[in-house]
């Protein structure tokens, strides 16, 4: 599209023009009324947000929740295992919900039974454990468990159950089954009743491809063979992804087992799924454990147990989540009322996916190279073969893949929520990305695990980016997503037109005169502010330069009897105003995690880093740590530490200053557990007074907590480095390491790039101070060359030695102006372009050795002597000589 746009100028591409004219017409929306109005009424929380992870979890509507809570307020629901009136009401309501579920899937209780589970994964586990497997013997055949390689982890995990009982598991590639379908043969040896199980997804959660539902009958009848083994085949259809946006007719496609998760369909409740079991297969299921409510009779002292006759009651151990089951009724009612049914949702979501697919496929760099690589087994020609999922990786103009983690960070700057990784589907990930089994093992050895941010290893992607649509998705969402791709990859805010989408509530094409169509303008300007950014434009936005721009900052007043100058300071020997190469120019600590910096010229060093650096953090009412990613206004909270009075003074505009003691009162302190970067830390609440102060400032409940002095949080092995012998680094509430160092020359290089005029002749100016504050470093040095610090393995600052752990992988927080709280995504984007692969800036440090028997300090003006990586073995050489090898 972009390449063509260079020739056709500003010609807009209509929504109808994006489709094949010969293709069947598809609907957008749900009849009379604007979809925008529905969004505003039912999903007002999405204002300013583009949510594109519906395959992960779709969203509940406001009226759905209101209807459910009203039900709870008006009725008394007791335990369904009791016999009182409220319990009878619960039992009868739950049974009605079972019927409603069966009706939703076009079947009845004559054919299927609904077994409630904790989710589709629990339903799969139930089948794996209860299926009538026959173990393979020395001279006898056994059952086979076959599964499509394009399956969720929870399906593949069933093989561990079968392996334990000597049942062979066989993965089947989609292409092998497609080719087998073409040459399907008649059933062989129909008298053999050895039970086998074949599992496949109705829709791939990786690419959205939809596999033929006809496979169910073909496999069961013996016309299609997953493997050439005689016996009776049963079919498990993993419908969790498929039924979120499409109707499933179980009267026509009678799979034996169908696991589903309800939050995939209407967002709430979570933690509730079901296994739909065909009644002809139900008697074959075997069960070992029995829980409450599943027994007709049993003896506690003898091996006597009679199960319930009802299949559902036999397998639903304990009390089901009956209130969540009742919530399903309101989910089905709301879905029907808002959309008219699953067929409409199917058409609507596919329309969005098809349009996005065509637009993405057409995006090109000026040199003709594609902007994205889409992983798909279809051309998005029909909702029968493709669901509303698009899986892709972003490319640069040379065809190199941009890591998915980097794309995710950029998307968050545009308030776009998407999914990255392999999506719990390693088989499809390997197939589409060309990752061999050996590469998977190699990636694991390199430190990559499922769900992390290690997106590229030796230039090879370990995963991809996925967007997916739900019933409340709109063309506005698509436009915002396309603007994001164009803005970040084609480096323009106006030269490349975004397709203009005209959609009516029935057919594609230009809207009729009397329609209430959603018309999406081709706007390429700056995106609208998110709710957080809107909040920042109010009265509490100001320049807090008094905190960070007061240079030089007077050193803290310390007890002179205990704080004599150390060799570290004496070794610097550099007077203020006469700073030479490789000296410390600025020192910052951040007493409250994610809040404003406290700049000093001289500060004590503790065993966790600078004394009191990130010793406190702000948490929400659930005890979850807040960062500037969720609450940019944290940077407007200004802490000051007074070591003499042993207090921290906290200031913010419009608020009276408040004092917090530096240490806890051990007699009154109640220790509680918190988490920082997956680590458990012991903390204590700093009291109701500061909690009220913070809650008033942020407009929501907040607490200030401090790491307990008895808390021991050890540094992990990261960045591929071991700690030096004899050291055991401990951490405060920092994310990664004790210190972060940045180089002024590196800031200058980024400053130059940011202040370069763009194609429109505009200039976006960032001061050096602004840029340096965004990176929230502890130590700033004035090195000679940009990014030379990335070649260092150790440094000495005076007599203190530090190990260089590795680079800091930057996130979207660097886009937040630390003096105003406003966002500007260009900082991250420019850094991403200049660093090419990873968005790295600054180096993590930790103490190589530290003797705290006498006070130690870091000071502005101290000399910084680096040790190069290639010379790290030669510790006998003076650091200055090693440095001169490359800088002289």
UniProtKB/Swiss-Prot annotation:
Disulfide bonds: none annotated. One of its GO terms (cellular component) is cytosol. It is an enzyme of class 2 (transferase). Keywords: Disease variant, Molybdenum cofactor biosynthesis, Phosphoprotein, Pyridoxal phosphate, Transferase. Changing residue 349 to I: In XAN2; abolishes enzyme activity; impairs pyridoxal 5'-phosphate binding. The modification N6-(pyridoxal phosphate)lysine is found at residue 264. One of its GO terms (biological process) is Mo-molybdopterin cofactor biosynthetic process. Pathway: Cofactor biosynthesis; molybdopterin biosynthesis. PROSITE patterns: MOSC. The active site is at residue 424. Its cofactor is pyridoxal 5'-phosphate. The keyword Protease does not apply. InterPro entries: Aminotrans_V_dom, MoCF_Sase_C, MoCo_sulfurase, MOCOS_middle, PyrdxlP-dep_Trfase, PyrdxlP-dep_Trfase_major, Pyrv_Knase-like_insert_dom_sf. It is linked to Xanthinuria 2: A disorder characterized by excretion of very large amounts of xanthine in the urine and a tendency to form xanthine stones. Uric acid is strikingly diminished in serum and urine. In addition, XAN2 patients cannot metabolize allopurinol into oxypurinol due to dual deficiency of xanthine dehydrogenase and aldehyde oxidase. Belongs to the class-V pyridoxal-phosphate-dependent aminotransferase family. MOCOS subfamily. Sulfurates the molybdenum cofactor. Sulfation of molybdenum is essential for xanthine dehydrogenase (XDH) and aldehyde oxidase (ADO) enzymes in which molybdenum cofactor is liganded by 1 oxygen and 1 sulfur atom in active form. In vitro, the C-terminal domain is able to reduce N-hydroxylated prodrugs, such as benzamidoxime. This is Molybdenum cofactor sulfurase.
């Amino acid at each position: 599209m972009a390449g063509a746009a260079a020739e056709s100028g500003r010609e807009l591409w209509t929504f109808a023009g994006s489709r094949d004219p010969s293709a069947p017409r598809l609907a957008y929306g749900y009849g009379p009324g604007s979809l925008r109005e529905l969004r505003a009424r039912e999903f007002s929380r999405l204002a300013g947000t583009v949510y594109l992870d519906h395959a992960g979890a779709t969203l509940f509507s406001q009226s759905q929740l209101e209807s459910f809570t009203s039900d709870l307020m008006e009725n008394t629901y007791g335990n369904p295992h009791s016999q009182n009136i409220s319990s009878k009401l619960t039992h009868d309501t739950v049974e009605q919900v079972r019927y409603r579920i069966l009706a939703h899937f076009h079947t009845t209780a004559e054919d299927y039974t609904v077994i409630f589970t904790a989710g589709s994964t629990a339903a799969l586990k139930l089948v794996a454990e209860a299926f009538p497997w026959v173990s393979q013997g020395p001279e006898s055949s056994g059952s086979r468990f076959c599964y499509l390689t394009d399956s969720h982890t929870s399906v593949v995990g069933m093989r561990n159950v079968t392996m334990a009982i000597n049942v062979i598991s066989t993965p089947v590639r989609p292409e092998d089954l497609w080719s087998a379908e073409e040459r399907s043969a008649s059933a062989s040896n129909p008298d053999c009743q050895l039970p086998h199980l074949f599992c496949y997804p109705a829709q791939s959660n990786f690419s959205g491809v939809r596999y033929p539902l006809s496979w169910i009958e073909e496999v069961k009848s013996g016309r299609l063979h997953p493997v050439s083994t005689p016996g009776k085949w049963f079919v498990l259809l993993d419908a969790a992804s498929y039924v979120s946006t499409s109707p499933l007719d179980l009267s026509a496609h009678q799979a034996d087992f169908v696991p589903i998760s309800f939050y995939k369909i209407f967002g709430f409740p979570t933690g509730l799924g079901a296994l739909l079991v065909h009644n002809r297969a139900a008697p074959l299921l075997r069960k070992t454990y029995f829980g409450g409510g599943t027994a007709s009779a049993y003896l506690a002292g003898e091996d006597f147990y009679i199960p319930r006759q009802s299949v559902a009651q036999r397998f639903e151990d304990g009390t089901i989540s009956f209130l969540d089951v009742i919530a399903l009724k309101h989910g089905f009612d709301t879905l029907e009322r808002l959309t008219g049914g699953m067929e409409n949702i199917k058409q609507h979501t596919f329309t969005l996916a098809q349009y996005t697919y065509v637009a993405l496929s057409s995006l090109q760099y000026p040199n003709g190279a594609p902007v994205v690589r889409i992983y798909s087994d279809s051309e998005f020609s029909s909702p029968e073969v493709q669901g509303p999922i698009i899986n892709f990786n972003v490319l640069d103009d040379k065809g190199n893949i941009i890591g998915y983690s980097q794309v995710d960070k950029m998307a968050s700057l545009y308030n776009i929520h998407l999914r990255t990784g392999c999506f719990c589907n390693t088989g499809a990930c390997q197939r589409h990305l060309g990752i061999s089994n050996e590469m998977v093992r190699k990636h694991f050895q390199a430190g990559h695990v499922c769900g992390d941010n290690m997106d590229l290893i030796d230039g090879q992607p370990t995963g991809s980016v996925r967007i997916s649509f739900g019933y409340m998705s709109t063309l506005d969402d698509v436009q915002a997503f396309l603007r994001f791709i164009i803005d970040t990859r084609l480096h323009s805010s106006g030269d490349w037109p975004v397709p203009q989408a005209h959609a009516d509530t029935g057919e594609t094409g230009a809207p009729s005169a009397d329609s209430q169509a959603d018309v999406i303008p081709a706007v390429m300007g700056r995106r609208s502010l998110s709710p957080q950014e809107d909040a920042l434009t109010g009265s509490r936005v100001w320049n807090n330069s008094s905190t960070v721009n007061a240079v030089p900052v007077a050193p803290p007043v310390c007890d002179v009897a205990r704080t004599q100058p150390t060799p570290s300071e004496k070794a610097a020997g550099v007077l203020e105003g006469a700073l030479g190469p490789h000296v410390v120019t600025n020192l910052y600590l951040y007493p409250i995690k994610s809040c404003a910096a406290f700049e000093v010229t001289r500060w004590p060093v503790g065993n966790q880093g600078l004394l009191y650096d990130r010793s406190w953090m702000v948490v929400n009412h659930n005890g979850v740590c807040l960062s500037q990613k969720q609450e940019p206004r944290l940077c407007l909270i200004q802490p000051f530490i007074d070591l003499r009075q042993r207090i921290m003074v906290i200031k913010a505009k419009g608020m009276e200053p408040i004092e917090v003691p530096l240490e806890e009162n051990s007699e009154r302190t109640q220790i509680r557990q918190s988490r920082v970067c997956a680590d458990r830390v012991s903390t204590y609440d700093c009291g109701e007074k500061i909690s009220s102060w913070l809650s008033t400032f942020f407009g929501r409940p907040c607490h200030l907590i401090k790491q307990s002095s008895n808390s021991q949080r050890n540094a992990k092995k990261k960045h591929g480095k071991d700690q030096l012998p004899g050291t055991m680094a401990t951490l405060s509430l920092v994310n990664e390491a004790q210190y972060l160092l940045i180089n002024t020359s590196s800031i200058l290089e980024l400053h130059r790039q940011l202040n370069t005029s763009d194609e429109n002749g505009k200039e976006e100016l960032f001061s050096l101070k602004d840029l340096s504050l965004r990176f929230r470093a502890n130590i700033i040095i004035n090195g000679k060359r940009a990014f030379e610090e990335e070649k260092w393995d150790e440094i000495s600052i005076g007599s203190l030695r530090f190990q260089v752990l590795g680079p800091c992988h930057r996130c979207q927080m660097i886009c937040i102006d630390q003096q105003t709280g406003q966002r500007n995504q260009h900082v991250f984007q420019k850094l991403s372009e200049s660093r090419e692969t990873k968005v790295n800036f600054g180096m993590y440090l930790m103490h190589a050795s530290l003797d705290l028997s006498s006070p130690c300090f870091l000071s502005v003006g101290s000399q910084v002597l680096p040790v190069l990586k290639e010379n790290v073995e030669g510790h006998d050489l003076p650091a200055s000589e090693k440095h001169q090898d490359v800088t002289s």
